[in-house]
Amino acid sequence: ALSALPLPSAERRTLQALQDWTQREGQRLQPLLTARQAAGQVRECHGDLHLGNLVQLADGPQLFDAIEFSEALRFIDPIADVAFLCMDLQARGRPDLGWHFLNGWLEHSGDYAGLALLQWYLVYRALVRAMVAGLRWGQSGQSGQDASAEAEAAWQEVQRYLTLADLLRQPRPRGLWLAQGVSGSGKTYATTPLVAARAMVRLRADVERKRLFGLAPTANSAAQLSESIYTPEATERTYAQLLALARTVLQAGYGVLV
């Protein structure tokens, strides 16, 4: 739909580069997409999870206007919904909230393998928003001296999302950071600002230790499993899991803080 609009030459070149990139990446990622679908990762999601479909109420954020008319657009890999919200937060000038949301979702789901698809979905979702804005722009008149305020706003949105999509497809700097301290020393508190400042994924030993024993991240592990979760053997398993997950994050193209 975007390519059918009378875009200026600069935006048309950007769009062509993005279309070429998404096609190449889609082909490269196809085996992973197929494998995740076979493993049951595709499920009923929101399908249109941008900030225009989210409201902050007194008891927390509430989603609305999920896609109901098309199962093909609603039954998707959850990382596609996660990417949509992260992308839109960045488009609205709050990438920090996007990184905190992503890390919270990863801790809850444990789906670090899905990070291999994140960049592709980020770009795809930015192009979706550019397309929606482009349709509004095309319907209200093109940019120019006589353009309406609505057309100008739509055109600026097209530019914003195209620019963001082009930025999101670029390789990211990767690195491995380690935080060390005894239990209860404040590692989580101290490293939380770094998650957004450095735009990275954080792996928490206590969360992954609990996951190995079938506990939720917020579960009281001492009360449920006594000392068994903190034996030397359990610690070795936890460290091995952290190493494997750190490798997964780095291979997906993201920095990681352990």
Residues covered by each model-derived region:
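ATP-dependent phospho-/nucleotidyl transfer catalytic cores
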Residues: 1-51, 55-175
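Short catalytic-loop micro-motif centered on adjacent basic/acidic residues
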Residues: 256-258
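Hydrophobic anchor at the beta1->P-loop junction of P-loop NTPases
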Residues: 177-179
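Conserved lysine of the Walker
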Residues: 187
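Conserved substrate/cofactor phosphate-moiety recognition/catalytic segment
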Residues: 192-254
